[in-house]
Amino acid sequence: MDVKACYQNAKALLEGHFLLSSGFHSNYYLQSAKVLENPKLAEQLALELAKQIQNARLNIECVCSPAIGGILAGYELARALGVRFIFTERVNGVMALRRGFEVKPNEKILVCEDIITTGKSAMECAKVLEEKGAHIVAFAALANRGICKRTHSSLKAQEDACLPSELPLFALEDFVFDMHEPKHCPLCTTSVAIKPGSRGN
């Protein structure tokens, strides 16, 4: 499946000067919501991702996503895997498990995002679940921005990667774009970074 083409066809691969939720600036932005607004395409992407996870023979009892960006991807992946789905959300800037969601002791949970950049949000989600007694077995995303090490990819983890190296990250594609710390961003000399979504927008 050509994931890049899916993003391009959905006009979800944006070019400009963007502030990512990770804090980095980039000349490209992946707007997964535009891809996932098509239920059939969302289902197909999730089924492809589920195949990787099933081939790894992991025992997964639940999928959890950090709101808001990961919810659609996580729900579709849970459906493809035949397991339940829950999500965490920020309350006054702190990730929390709410809405009556519960975690069983040692419940095997996969954390799913739409896009993984550094993995910071995914780790915040995982920490909340672990504090409730869950056992995190893997991470997943539709696309990986190349900072974290993806299963079946030749790319190595970068210094800013937050995901633990001992757990697998499943994703359909690596999207490797230039990313800059704000104080060293060459794009800032000619324009101001915009934030098209996720946190706080």
From Swiss-Prot:
GO function terms (MF aspect): magnesium ion binding; orotate phosphoribosyltransferase activity
EC number: 2.4.2.10
PROSITE patterns named among the record's database cross-references: PUR_PYR_PR_TRANSFER
Binding site for orotate: T117, R145
Entry cofactors: Mg(2+)
InterPro entries xref list: OPRT, Orotate_PRibTrfase_bac, PRibTrfase_dom, PRTase-like
Binding residues annotated for 5-phospho-alpha-D-ribose 1-diphosphate, in chain numbering: E113, D114, I115, I116, T117, T118, G119, K120, S121
Keywords: Glycosyltransferase, Magnesium, Pyrimidine biosynthesis, Transferase
Residue stretches spanning the membrane: none
Pathway the protein contributes to: Pyrimidine metabolism; UMP biosynthesis via de novo pathway; UMP from orotate: step 1/2
Function per UniProt: Catalyzes the transfer of a ribosyl phosphate group from 5-phosphoribose 1-diphosphate to orotate, leading to the formation of orotidine monophosphate (OMP).
Similarity remark: Belongs to the purine/pyrimidine phosphoribosyltransferase family. PyrE subfamily.
Quaternary structure note: Homodimer.
Name of the protein in question: Orotate phosphoribosyltransferase
Originating organism: Helicobacter acinonychis (strain Sheeba)
Upper lineage: Bacteria, Pseudomonadati, Campylobacterota, Epsilonproteobacteria, Campylobacterales
Gene (UniProt): pyrE
